[in-house]
Structures are given as C-alpha cells and as structure tokens.
Amino acid sequence: DSQKVDGVQLIRTIADKDKDEEAAKKALDLFVSSFESKIKKRVEILALNYGYNENVAFEAIRCAFNKVWLYPTFDMGKSSCTNEENAIIIWLVKIAFSQMCQFTRTGECAQISEEEDLSVIENIDDVVNSIHVADLDPMVKMQYVMAFKKKISVLDEKHRIIYLTYKAYQRSGKKLPRKLLEKLRKRLGLSQSAIRVYKKQ
C-alpha cells in the first residue's frame, strides 16, 4: 500500500464512537478498505476447508467488521505477533471464523443495527422464517415443518405462541429481549411468572 494505515489507531477511534461517531465511522471505512483484502483469501480458504462456499466467506467477513464496530477489543498485548498489522489480521480472521460458524448455524451473524424487528410469533410459518429454515433443501424443510406441526398441534393457543416465540428468538441460554417479553405479556394478558409456568409445561 502506498499509504500505511495505523490499524491500532483506527480501532481506538472506533472504540471512541460514543464521543465522536462521525470520526468512528470514517475510521471503520478506512479500516475495512485497508484490511478486507488482507483477510479475504484466508477466510475463503477457511470456508472451503469446512465445506462452505464463497458466499459464506463473504458474510463472515462482513460480519467480522460489524463485530469490530460493536466490540473493538483488539489488544496487542495478547498477540504473539510483534508486527501490529499481522496481529490485527490474525485477530480479524479469528473473528471471521467465529462469525462463519454462527452464520452457518443460525443464518445470521453480527449486525450493526441494534434495533431488531421483534414480533410475537403466532404461527409455524413465522418461526420457520425467523430461524432460517427457509434456506434448507425443500425435502428437509418439509420434514422439519411436518415434525414441528405435529409437536405444536397438541398445544392450546397461549402455549403455542409462547413456545414458538421462544423457539424463534431464544439463543443458547440467553434471555428474550425485554421489548419482546413486554409484547408477549400484552398479547397474552399474562404476567411474566405465568409465562414462565406455561413455558415449562
């Protein structure tokens, strides 16, 4: 590169986004344009080694930079590299790999937008769309939907809505977003403790 970019300084500027968001956005743009080409090949090779295609590698890279914006936690002190640029490249490739695993598992990875579209899930089509079963092979998808329908056919309306909403939004051990719980309580006219009882049944 004709112009040497100080990646560590850019990450610091991104980390100060609460103080100066405009400068942080510019720093992120410069960071992406400088490092994207440097990690692209490595991430594509990783994807191929794990049986994924270029599209998955592309998403993983995009999400890795989203993650840098959300959590600019690079620490040169934790790197075994003495060269800052190489240390950042290795750090980014690790993030991209974890984002790749997340993307292939759930169909989504780190997004910069914090505001999610949180809606109470009332029927099976909504849950199928929300957990990205839509991308599956049609036969596999049909089997999944059939098994799912059988499972929820025995539930009454309140149990069904609670089960489907948790199924769509709950990520490994994490609680549902507070906004969504409020919507669920309002929709069903139940308290949070009543919802917990329903969920256990």
Give the ranges of each region predicted by the language model.
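Short amphipathic alpha helix immediately N-terminal
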Residues: V32, K149-K183
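Sigma70-family region 2
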Residues: I45-N49, R62-E85
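A short, charge-rich alpha-helical start-of-domain segment used by transcription regulators
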Residues: T13-I45, N55
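Structural recognition of an alpha-helix C-terminal capping motif at a helix-to-coil junction
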Residues: N55-N66, N83-S98
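Acidic, proline/glycine-rich intrinsically disordered inter-domain spacer in sigma factors
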Residues: D18, E22, S119-S153
